[in-house]
């Protein structure tokens, strides 16, 4: 029987905290037209300007969260890869990153050399965005075409509303919800509004809506923000959260363009003003902890919240290699994968 490999795909990380490694990683990341959607000359100019100061700043941030084993994102992704192996009897389980190492091209070439002809991609992004899902799948297509690999590829679609994913979220978060707290903030990664407007053509689509109830199926399939709201609403219902004891925000905005709101940094100040003293924060757009969760929220966000008058901010770990997540990912990868 032909083996079917499972390829876990995530965003990536610098090789180290050295400034030159961070610069190389940021250059690859920001020059992706799905990330910075400007014509090449303007994109090259903008990225060159960003790379004057940003690598040193980011290297300092990475140094604050780097583990002895390496990048937390890579280490945790490797743990997930190992945990998945007993749950995927169809063939090898591999890991690749869209930027940095292990590179998609290297992993696919290695699979082809080993005689693997079928691959199931598992992009580890619950919600759809061109800057995550699409660019990863396009890179897989490019590599297969460039090297004429002849691989039969299927891919796991976004799983923001899948019951097994939501149940895994609830199970992983429940111990923290049982601790004394005033509020739970679900902080998703942000996205420039124009990225959504390019995909959702309906001019009536509301990018400030407080919930996803009135979103059409066509818009929901393409709107990252609406999918985040749908995840948050379904999670809150499953977890039995009281209305008013939880809220949604969007983090990690870059540059001067308008990004989807509300912004996490503004929300932290707002919650303090509302009297929230003990805050829990979870980041459901990430399945593995990384610089955006550990440093941006767990360190800078916590410092901001306490400086504004809060007592404590507790960052809830991502799904990482939680057993419930491992089982959910294996089930979804086998049941939902469709031709690429």
Swiss-Prot record:
One cellular component term from this protein's GO annotations in UniProt: cytoplasm
Disulfide linkage: none
Signal sequence, renumbered to the chain: none
Enzyme class name: lyase
InterPro entries in alphabetical order: Ferrochelatase, Ferrochelatase_C, Ferrochelatase_N
Catalytic activity: heme b + 2 H(+) = protoporphyrin IX + Fe(2+)
GO molecular function, one term: metal ion binding
Binding-site residues for Fe cation, renumbered to this chain: 189, 292
The EC number(s) this enzyme carries: 4.98.1.1
GO biological process terms on file: heme biosynthetic process
Subcellular localization: Cytoplasm
Entry keywords, A to Z: Cytoplasm, Heme biosynthesis, Iron, Lyase, Metal-binding, Porphyrin biosynthesis
Pathway where it operates: Porphyrin-containing compound metabolism; protoheme biosynthesis; protoheme from protoporphyrin-IX: step 1/1
Cited function: Catalyzes the ferrous insertion into protoporphyrin IX.
NCBIfam families: hemH
Homology family: Belongs to the ferrochelatase family.
Identification of the protein by name: Ferrochelatase
């Amino acid at each position: 029987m032909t083996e079917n490999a499972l390829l876990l795909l995530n965003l990536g990380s610098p090789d180290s905290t050295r400034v030159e490694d961070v610069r190389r990683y940021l250059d690859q990341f920001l020059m992706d037209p799905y990330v910075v959607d400007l014509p090449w000359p303007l994109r090259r100019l903008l990225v060159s300007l960003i790379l004057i100061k940003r690598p040193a700043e980011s290297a300092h941030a990475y140094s604050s969260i780097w583990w002895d084993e390496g990048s937390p994102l890579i280490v945790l992704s490797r743990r997930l890869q190992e945990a998945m192996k007993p749950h995927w009897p169809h063939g090898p389980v591999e890991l690749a990153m869209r930027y940095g190492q292990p590179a998609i091209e290297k992993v696919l070439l290695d699979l082809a050399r080993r005689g693997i002809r079928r691959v199931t991609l598992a992009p580890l992004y619950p919600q759809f965005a061109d800057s995550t899902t699409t660019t990863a799948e396009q890179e897989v297509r490019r590599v297969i075409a460039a090297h004429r690999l002849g691989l039969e590829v299927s891919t796991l679609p976004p799983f923001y509303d899948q019951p097994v994913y939501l149940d895994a979220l609830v199970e992983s978060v429940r111990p923290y919800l049982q601790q004394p707290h005033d509020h739970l903030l679900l902080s998703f990664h942000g996205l420039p509004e124009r990225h959504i407007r390019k995909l959702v053509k309906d001019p009536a689509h509301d990018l400030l809506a407080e919930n996803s109830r009135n979103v059409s199926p066509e818009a929901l399939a393409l709107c990252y923000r609406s999918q985040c709201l749908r995840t948050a609403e379904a999670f809150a219902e499953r977890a039995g959260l009281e209305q008013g004891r939880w809220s949604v925000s969007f983090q990690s905005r870059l540059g001067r363009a308008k990004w989807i709101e509300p912004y996490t940094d503004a929300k932290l100040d707002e919650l303090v003003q509302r009297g929230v003293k003990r805050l829990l924060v979870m980041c459901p757009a990430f399945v593995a902890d990384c610089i955006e969760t550990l440093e941006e929220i767990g360190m800078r966000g916590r410092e901001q919240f306490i400086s504004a008058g809060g007592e404590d901010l507790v960052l809830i770990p991502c799904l990482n290699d939680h057993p419930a997540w491992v089982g959910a990912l294996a089930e979804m990868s086998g049941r939902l994968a469709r031709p690429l």
